[in-house]
Amino acid sequence: MQANGAGGGGGGGGGGGGGGGGGGGQGQTPELACLSAQNGESSPSSSSSAGDLAHANGLLPSAPSAASNNSNSLNVNNGVPGGAAAASSATVAAASATTAASSSLATPELGSSLKKKKRLSQSDEDVIRLIGQHLNGLGLNQTVDLLMQESGCRLEHPSATKFRNHVMEGDWDKAENDLNELKPLVHSPHAIVVRGALEISQTLLGIIVRMKFLLLQQKYLEYLEDGKVLEALQVLRCELTPLKYNTERIHVLSGYLMCSHAEDLRAKAEWEGKGTASRSKLLDKLQTYLPPSVMLPPRRLQTLLRQAVELQRDRCLYHNTKLDNNLDSVSLLIDHVCSRRQFPCYTQQILTEHCNEVWFCKFSNDGTKLATGSKDTTVIIWQVDPDTHLLKLLKTLEGHAYGVSYIAWSPDDNYLVACGPDDCSELWLWNVQTGELRTKMSQSHEDSLTSVAWNPDGKRFVTGGQRGQFYQCDLDGNLLDSWEGVRVQCLWCLSDGKTVLASDTHQRIRGYNFEDLTDRNIVQEDHPIMSFTISKNGRLALLNVATQGVHLWDLQDRVLVRKYQGVTQGFYTIHSCFGGHNEDFIASGSEDHKVYIWHKRSELPIAELTGHTRTVNCVSWNPQIPSMMASASDDGTVRIWGPAPFIDHQNIEEECSSMDS
């Protein structure tokens, strides 16, 4: 506006100069023209001004400067007719030129930013889909929609989404139609590769039939629960039976027609009933037949996190707590690490009531008592305090003239059998509750009864020794069965109630069946087997082998799994044990006065416990208190091991030296 007055003066002074500039005589700078255009003081009201704007914005090819500009175009303030249009055109042209210039600068940056947007990798897309599925399960549907929109990913195939919704709504006809839409996706080669864990013999057509069968089965059960027997019968006859799949299951389904009420149906079918729970389970089964590119497996993120936590626990050398698959019980923000101070490698108590070498120790099955046998001819039963985990003397069982070298608790912990060394022909059966001797058994003065094991029924036990005796007896000491010529070193009864494992003088472990009187070789070593014990599941055997140490065998595959290092094992009988939660650990005494502890998967010891002054003959891990362990030694003491207290750190380091493997 103020520039227009200056333009008028310039025009009066000399129009030729303005013509030479091809528009410079308009007397308006580009900056002011842009400002005027932005303020709405001039607008492209003619076709020429619109064309100039189009040229400036690059929408049309550039045209040469107009030669018709003259001094008349400067008379906008002088009221000259037609001057306003020319001035307006010039103003817009200048503004457009400025806009074009700025656009030419901004456009490359915008294009560059678009080009710089990172393309998601396959793993990134997988993570986004996993997060989306998890959020969806939490009900954060809007968040999932925004996540998928911004990332450009797809949570699942649209046909799979329809299928899911129709299954959860119980719209079985539509769900069956959706299944037909999903058929090409199931038949794709990619689907075959992803489902590699399924049986190879399954044909693609068979997969569709199986999925359809599951759908119709749910439909049938829901009809029955609703009392629509005729509709259910129609599904059974006209839809399920023609599939010609799993006829045995169809016979079972037909039997549900006889159920008188819904509760009876749910009980017999082991089915939650019509609703979200049963349909969700159905959907989980159906998802296993679809490739993850179409529909993610159920709760996939939780599955991966659970696997990660389990792997960390497996790799933790000192993990000795109950395995909990609930992710809420652990922190996902840090790695799982157990402290060695939580491990039973600190002496909590020293029991000194025996007055000679202690040859054996064994916790009861319920973990409330400990029995120790000694050369001093006594068995002492100790009570475990459930709160302090300290032991106090409960009973002393006397009269074992040759000493006590082996003890076995009955399955119900009501009885205890004690054996002596090689030259002992007697066996004592004690009532633990009363402390009374129920049976003192001896078949012959020439017998050697050095080992004993209880049958799982608690009514029988087997015993034997190195002089060729191998008997099965009842609680009164009556002989039930016997094997001749078996020189027994150690015994164990398997959970089947029929098979007895026995190590003998031929450096082997054989299985003896007392029902059909058959036997078979299971383990063969190259050196004498001094003792052995079996894991709770009956799969693993832990052997103390003369001059070799501790060996772990797989009884099912009959292979040597691992040889544990560090222990000193000569020809003394040393008893090792499984222990800890899930029996992940192995402990053994040693002739170098130490107790060695290994993680089951590691050959090197994770702890060496010192304190005894002579050979450690036996170690027993409390089956109910994973942080408690007992060791018996020729030094006449029994040591109780537990976690370290929160003080006395120096003594902890001295008594528990650890080596990570």
Swiss-Prot record:
Gene Ontology biological-process annotations: proteasome-mediated ubiquitin-dependent protein catabolic process
Main localisation: cytoplasm
Residue span, CTLH domain: 156-231
Tissue: Broadly expressed, with highest levels in heart and skeletal muscle.
Keyword set, alphabetical order: Cytoplasm, Disease variant, Intellectual disability, Mitochondrion, Nucleus, Phosphoprotein, Repeat, WD repeat
Signal peptide coordinates: none
Protein name: WD repeat-containing protein 26
The species this protein was found in: Homo sapiens (Human)
